[in-house]
């Protein structure tokens, strides 16, 4: 197996590590992407979360949030789709269509169908001052999309898998509507693999805190759990990219779901010192002074390419 190292230097403070696997191994480090982070919209079957994304004001506010890192991830997702330009593409949990935009730019005669259950998010995307070419929207549930089998050449879901109450049903449904040989790309934040009981307890605590806002279906995945999910559904997995973005700054502004991560930090610091130390080791450190908090660490995202067997 070959190994290649790339270094690409830029500006600002953040950096990204890309560990790719495709019949070989490639490591690249890109410095200077900054530390603005933002998650895309995803589904959650709890009442509160669904209500938020069905609210027009919240949907519009969500659509305004973006970052260099999120844009970078969207481009990498588009790369992994390996488009020729004439594909029929399903964008599952499309939200306002932000990730569909860079994908659409690579199409010539193809089109993207974006499906979401939150009508307010779809409306905001539809009203955008710069409409996405060859992009069509429709309402629907992720685990029961309103399309015939073998309808799409490509499919993707971004920043949403951790919100699905039935992720196995979702990836199986995508397999149904994909044509033989079609690609399904999953982009999602990932947490560290649990190596011992402390890691397991920390993972439980993290999910508990996030569920207060995002509902009972919320669950962070690990790289191996997403790989197992796709493999069990019947996909062949030719490529997995793990990308880690670092931050070193005052406050949690721009860090994805940073407020919730800080809640985790504050609670484990008070209740479980052992978990606090593990959080610092696996994710980030935090130091308070006066009314400010300095945070330093990194969060990871996974890009997974699943192919429907011929």
Predicted segment positions?
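C-terminal helical/coil "lid" or tail adjacent to the Rossmann-like core of SAM-dependent
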Residues: 241-295
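A short glycine-rich, Lys/Arg-flanked "PGG" loop and its adjoining helix->strand segment in the class I
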Residues: 168-183
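Conserved class I S-adenosyl-L-methionine
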Residues: 3-8, 12, 22-84, 98-102, 185-208, ...
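Short alpha-helix
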Residues: 218-233
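A conserved beta-strand element that flanks and buttresses the S-adenosyl-L-methionine
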Residues: 156
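Class I SAM-dependent methyltransferase SAM/SAH-binding core
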Residues: 90-92, 96-144
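Core SAM-dependent methyltransferase catalytic element
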Residues: 257-258, 299-310
């Amino acid at each position: 197996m070959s190994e290649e190292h790339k270094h690409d230097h830029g500006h600002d403070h953040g950096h990204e590590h890309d560990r790719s696997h495709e019949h070989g191994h490639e490591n690249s480090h890109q410095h200077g992407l900054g530390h603005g982070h933002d998650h895309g919209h995803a589904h959650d079957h709890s009442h509160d979360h669904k209500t938020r994304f069905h609210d027009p004001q919240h949907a519009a506010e969500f659509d305004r949030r973006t970052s260099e890192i999120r844009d970078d991830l969207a481009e990498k997702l588009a790369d992994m789709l390996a488009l020729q330009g004439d594909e029929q593409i399903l964008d599952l949990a499309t939200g306002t269509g932000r990730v569909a935009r860079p994908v659409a730019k690579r199409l010539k005669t193809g089109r993207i169908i974006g499906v979401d259950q939150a009508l307010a998010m779809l409306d905001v995307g539809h009203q955008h001052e710069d409409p996405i070419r060859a992009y069509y929207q429709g309402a629907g549930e992720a685990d029961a999309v309103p399309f015939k089998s073998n309808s799409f050449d490509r499919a993707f879901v971004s920043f949403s898998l951790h919100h699905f109450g039935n992720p196995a049903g979702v990836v199986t449904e995508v397999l149904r509507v994909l044509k033989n040989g079609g690609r399904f790309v999953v982009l999602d934040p990932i947490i560290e693999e649990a190596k011992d009981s402390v890691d397991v307890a920390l993972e439980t605590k993290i999910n508990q805190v996030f569920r207060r806002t995002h509902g009972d279906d919320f669950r962070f995945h690990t790289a191996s759990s997403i790989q197992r999910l796709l493999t069990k559904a019947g996909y062949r997995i030719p490529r997995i990219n793990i990308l880690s973005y670092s931050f070193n700054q005052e406050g949690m502004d721009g860090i994805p779901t940073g407020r919730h991560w800080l809640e985790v930090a504050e609670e484990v610091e008070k209740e479980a010192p052992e978990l606090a130390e593990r959080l610092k080791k696996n994710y980030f450190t935090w130091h308070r002074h006066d009314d400010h908090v300095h945070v330093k660490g990194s969060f990871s995202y996974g890009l997974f390419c699943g192919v429907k067997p011929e």
